[in-house]
Amino acid sequence: MIIRFDNVSYTYQKGTPYQHQAIHDVNTEFEQGKYYAIVGQTGSGKSTLIQNINALLKPTTGTVTVDDITITHKTKDKYIRPVRKRIGMVFQFPESQLFEDTVEREMIFGPKNFKMNLDEAKNYAHRLLMDLGFSRDVMSQSPFQMSGGQMRKIAIVSILAMNPDIIVVDEPTAGLDPQSKRQVMRLLKSLQTDENKTIILISHDMNEVARYADEVIVMKEGSIVSQTSPKELFKDKEKLADWHIGLPEIVQLQYDFEQKHQTKLKDIALTEEAFVSLYKEWQHEK
């Protein structure tokens, strides 16, 4: 499943004194099975971009193509329904949208609306919940008797229960404790590597971006100013400063190390494990 943006612009409240163009002339493509991160300052157009992916917003100009379905500002909702079934959207603080009295009912709400096999959806959701550290009897429990972090994970899995091909998540770990953050991010990565799902992550956490993403899209003032690998992105400190994007902690550590020892390691480390490997290699060659 490929998503392509061709010259996409979106204007809020068009034709009024309050109109605001949130994204303009966006051209990009999301390939099946890759992990994308979208980064940029607040107001750079990230959320507007992802809402155009499954036509929660329709382009003011330009086209969004999802496989063989082309979406314009004129496309009727009945033609978009197959797209929405295949793209799971998890917005910020999704726990605020929970409303069913048991986890099981929460899990089958989306699949029921799309007339999916409910037993398959329940089994799939239960497996994902177990991966996130829940007990076996979680399906009979009330989400409203759980902690905020548990409710967040329940809300995320309620979207994943529809088994979408593309998973779009907006700051999914904001406010979570470190263990829950790791659980959520590892689950998303496993869905990419084990089930060939496309992950599109909005995040301000460059540590997450460095560790998990295959490709990073940088947005500034409604435009894409860069689309590259994490390693290439974090090489250019001047551009990062101009875009107001910080360095991951491990990359900053590497730059500090190189400055202190007046050396240059052979590669940029995006994880602690990679840095240790580069450090050992440097020691061996010293």
From Swiss-Prot:
Where ATP binds, per the record, is at: G40, Q41, T42, G43, S44, G45, K46, S47
User: What is the protein's membrane topology class?
Assistant: Peripheral membrane protein
- Location(s), subcellular: Cell membrane
Q: Name one GO molecular function term.
A: ATP binding
Keywords assigned by UniProt, alphabetized: ATP-binding, Cell membrane, Membrane, Nucleotide-binding, Translocase, Transport
What does the record give as EC number?
Answer: 7.-.-.-
**SUPFAM superfamilies attached to this UniProt entry:** P-loop containing nucleoside triphosphate hydrolases
What GO cellular component entries does it have? ATP-binding cassette (ABC) transporter complex
**EC top class, in one word?**
translocase
Return any one Pfam family short name: ABC_tran
Q: How does it assemble?
A: Forms a stable energy-coupling factor (ECF) transporter complex composed of 2 membrane-embedded substrate-binding proteins (S component), 2 ATP-binding proteins (A component) and 2 transmembrane proteins (T component).
Q: Family per UniProt?
A: Belongs to the ABC transporter superfamily. Energy-coupling factor EcfA family.
Function as written in the Swiss-Prot or TrEMBL entry: ATP-binding (A) component of a common energy-coupling factor (ECF) ABC-transporter complex. Unlike classic ABC transporters this ECF transporter provides the energy necessary to transport a number of different substrates.
Specify the protein name.
Energy-coupling factor transporter ATP-binding protein EcfA2
- Which source organism does the UniProt entry give? Staphylococcus aureus (strain MRSA252)
